[in-house]
Structures are given as C-alpha cells and as structure tokens.
Amino acid sequence: MDLLKILDTAPEPAIVDARTMGVSGDTSGDYWLPAPMCLYQKELTDQIVSLHYSDILKYFETSDYKEDIVLQSMKTMCLNSQLVATHPYLLIDHFMPKSLLTKDIPGHLSETSGKFCVLRDLMNLVQEYAMETLLVCRPGRTMDLLEALLLGNKVNIRRHDGQSIKTKQKKTRYACTCHLVPSEAAKAIALERDTRLGLVICVDPTVDTRAPHIQSILAQQQRKYGRTVPTIRVAVINSIEHCELFFGKTLDRNTRDYLVNVSAAMVVLRDVVGTLPPDLRPIYSQNLRYLIDWLDTPERPWPLPDVYPVKVYTAMDVERSLLTEVKYSQNNDSLEDAFTNGKKRNHRSHGQGNGGNAPISYYQIKRLKNDYIGNPLKQDMEQLTGISNNKCKDGLLDYHLSSGTLTHKLLQAIGSVYENLQLQDVELSHFAAVEQNQTAIFESHKEALSTIKKQLEDAISKKQRNNTLVDEYLKNSQNERDQLEVLEADISDLLGQLDGRHQGFKQLWDDLNQTENTLALYRTNANAKRSEASYMEEELIRAEKSVAESENEQTQLLRDVEHLEALIQDCREKDKQQQQVIKNKSKDMEDDITQKKEAVLALQNQLGTIMEYLKQLQTPRVRSPSNGHRSKHRGYV
C-alpha cells in the first residue's frame, strides 16, 4: 500500500457502490463476468428467432409435431444464438483465410462483438501480470478468432489444439502467457511442468470444468501449488449464454425442461439481450479497471454481482413475445434517448402525422390478415366468436368486431373470456361429478350407520346376558363358599371331638398333611434330577461324537502334513538339481567370457600395432592453387 500517494493526492471516488449493485461477496472461485452486445448481434439474434418462428410455436403450444424435425430446429436455433453471442463471424461456415485474421483484426473483432470487447479490456489488464492464463473456448474458428484477438496484446500465445493462425511469430518474450485449450478434447492436454496457472477464462460459459482434460490441469495445479485457480465465465447478459448458465445449475442439460426453459427465456428476453444494467455501465466504460484490485489479490471476494436469476416463462409469454416486434437502437442510455427524441419532436413539421409513412411491420400484416397460429382458416371475428355485427349497440357498431382487425388487446380479451368459460365449465362438471360422488358417499354412510346400530344393539343384548350369567356365577360361588365354611367348621368340631376321645389325633392329622407336602416336594425334585440326568447323558453323547470327529480330523491333518513334507522334499531335490545345472552353465559362460576377453585383448594388441604402423607412414602435402598458378608437388616432407 502506497501511503504517501494516498495522503498526497485527493481521494478517488468509487466507480460504483457495491451495496446497491448487489455484490454477495462470492469466494467460490467460479465467477460470472457479464458482457454486452453490439447492435448487429442483437439484430442477428432477433432474425434467428424469426427464422424458427413456426417451429417455436409448434414446440411450445402443440404436441403432435414431428419430434426429430422440430427438436433439431430448436437445437439449431440455440446453437446459432450461442455463436452470435460469441461473435457474428462464427456463423460463416465456409473457408475463412487465416491471413485475413492477422490484418489489424483485433480492433475489428472488438467492434463487432461485445464479448470480444470485454475480453480485450480484460486481457489488457491481465497482460500486466507475470502469470499463466488458461483460456477455454470452442475448438475451430472460435479458437482462431480468440488467437487473432490475443495477437493485439503483449502476451505469449500457446495453442494446444489445431494449428496456429500465425506460424511466424516474433521471438519477443512477454511476462504473461496465454494457453488456448478447447472446451471439448478427445485426449488429455499436458502443460509444461513449470507452468503455474493464475487465472482461467471461459469464453464459452457452458464449459464444464469437470471435463477430464480440464480437470487434470486444474487438479495438477492444486496438487502442486495447493490453491484453487479462479475461473471467470464471460457470458452475454440476457442472452442464451446467461439462460444456460442459470438453468444449468439446477437442470440437466440433456432434459426437455432445460431446453424449454432456455428457449423460452431466450425468445422473451431478446428485446433486452446484451443490455447492461445502469449500475454496471460505469465499470465497462472505464475498461474494467474496477477489477484491478481483485486481480492483485484473487483471494478477495468477487466485486461483481452473481448470475442474475432468469424467470421461468410459459408458452403464453413466448407467443406474446413472438407477436411483438422488437426494435433496437444504437444507444442504450435511456436518458440520452429521451433527449434525442425530444430534439426530433421539436424539429418535426406540423403537417406530419404521428405515424407518417412508416411501413407496416411483418407481424402487423399477419394480424391484419387474420393469419396466426390460433386461426389456421383465417376466419374473421364474426365466425370465430359467433357474434354478428349486423345489430347495433346503442346506435353504434362494435368497432373491433366490425373492423376485422385482430389486435393484441382483443386477442387477450377473447383468450381470457374463453379461459374463464373453460374454467367455469370445468368447475360445473366438477360440481356435477362431486354431487354424484356425494350421493354415493351418503348412501354408503347410511348403510354403515344402520350396520353399526345393529351391531350396537347386539352388543348391548349380549352384555345384558353376560351380566346375568356373571350374577348367577357369583351367587353360586358365594353359596359354595358358605358351604365350605360350614364343612370346615364341622371338620374342626369333629377333630376336636376325636382329640377329646383319643389323645394326639389332631397332632397326627397335622403330621400327615405335612408329610404329604414333603413327599410332593421330593417328587418334584426327583423329576428335576431325572431331567438333568437325561440332559447330561445327551451332552456326553454329543461330546463323545465331537471327540471322535476331532480325532478323525487330526488323523487327516497328519496325513496332509506328511504328504506336504514329501512334496517339499521332492521340490528341494529338484531345486538342487536345477542349481547344479545353473552352476554348470554359469561356469561354461565364465569360460566363454574369459576366452572372449583374451580374444579382445589380442585384437586390441593387433589394433595398437596397426596404429603404430600407420603413424610411421609419411603422407605427401599438396599446395592449394593461388593467383592462377598450378599446384606443384614438392615431394615428401
């Protein structure tokens, strides 16, 4: 932080207020950078939608269409819209000379594409940093255009797919290096070992960073340097890229719901496609210098808002949007438009009408001719509504019905009336069905009530009978209890009389009862002992059986051990024999090596002798011809 500069200079006012702009403080590492559109891109987007007008209505309002044709048409519309959002040149499917891309093309690319203008401003900031930048885009012409744009920056370009558009590049080395990687690759892409990425820029916002070839690069950077590389997705606001980026978070890209939501939003939002909100315009007017602080410290929160939410539009919204003509202006500032329109109104001649001689648009002609999808026979309003316009109402004819002009207001009014009538018919049919159901339910409840009443009467009568029986049983038990008490009293009297006659009779009677109780206890214990003895006998039998099985298993194991020992002994004998054979072979090889060494030494001695002989030989010298004289042999030296 330069404190002297801060204290010596006046404070710079903030470009925008982050609180009013809706900055959420995102630090996820995957950020969205909205981009505008130029006027040509907006008009091309509207033309693409107009080309697929009938297929869009079939896709959203009917279900009896040929799925392969209409679905392919919708996918073609989405693809062309994506190409236009990136750059209009991508619609050219014939050969484009690569030499054309190198002739002052960076400026022209930025003029005809809002996204490339944002990329140019962003790369002008990134090129000031000594870091490696990864740019991911579609392969082919998109990468050619991106490389042509980067030729206007002071960066080193490393293209990892296809052939570079400029084969003879200068040897100048810059601090910033850009790696161009395709969004779809058949094989993994390997960067240099010392490459340390500082930023990833996705020109195609639908790039899946979880793709194997991209994930391998990012995972390698995270393993090597222990940090996540931040990713910036450049997407045109309110375009198909914006819709795909928003709906791709919650829906699978291969489902019908995803295609329906993206197509509907693209059609409805085409009147505001590429139009930045007022809060963001100062940032882009100053060439994205608002992002310098974040580029200095990428760990800081992203200073721009998150992806703006996109509404889920219905088929009615799509049809209403298709019936509305879209007009674009070169200037997006509403205040300046107001001043411009005011000046035009002041200079307008008084004799000129409101409409002037402006030509009737395509959609107005379709409405005037009653040629729209809900009226395939082109019938007038009298036939459609069944209301005759021959009768007068308060002395005047109904203008809308008599004119035969189908306006938006009349269409909406008729549609709302038909919708209300349909809802009322559905409600009446529902009430009729409910009335029949209620009658059937009432009859069933009535039958159930009679059944329950009958069951209740039976239960009450049964309860009364049971109460009577209980009273009788209680009375009988009480009588028997009284009889027992009388008998016990008689027995005690008799025992007293017998005890009076015979001394000790009562004591004998008590001893007899006690002996009987003791005998019963002994019998119970004896039965328990017998059960325990039988259980122990069974356990002994099981134990003997288990011991016999264990002995058999032990015998079998001993046999297996003896067999294994015999096999081991055989293997040892075989190993000894093989070892002896190997020793003999190694000895033979050592003898051969010794012989060959002796032969090599002999050859070396011969070679030394030959070299000495060659050194002793004298060679003649020859003078090179000079000054036009012939060379002469001077003999040997």
Swiss-Prot record:
Q: Which Pfam families does the entry mention?
A: HDA2-3
Does this UniProt record's set of keywords contain Coiled coil? yes
Source superkingdom: Eukaryota
Q: Which GO terms describe its molecular function?
A: chromatin binding; DNA binding; histone deacetylase activity; nucleosome array spacer activity
| Biological process, per Gene Ontology | chromosome segregation; negative regulation of transcription by RNA polymerase II; positive regulation of transcription by RNA polymerase II; regulatory ncRNA-mediated gene silencing
* Gene3D superfamilies, sorted: 3.40.50.12360
Location within or outside the cell: Nucleus
One GO cellular component term of this record is: HDA1 complex
Q: Where is this region: Disordered?
A: 618-637
Q: Provide the assembly information.
A: Probable component of some histone deacetylase complex.
Known role: Required for activity of histone deacetylase complexes that are responsible for the deacetylation of lysine residues on the N-terminal part of the core histones (H2A, H2B, H3 and H4). Histone deacetylation gives a tag for epigenetic repression and plays an important role in transcriptional regulation, cell cycle progression and developmental events.
Family named by the database record: Belongs to the HDA2/3 family. HDA3 subfamily.
What this protein is called in its record is HDA1 complex subunit 3
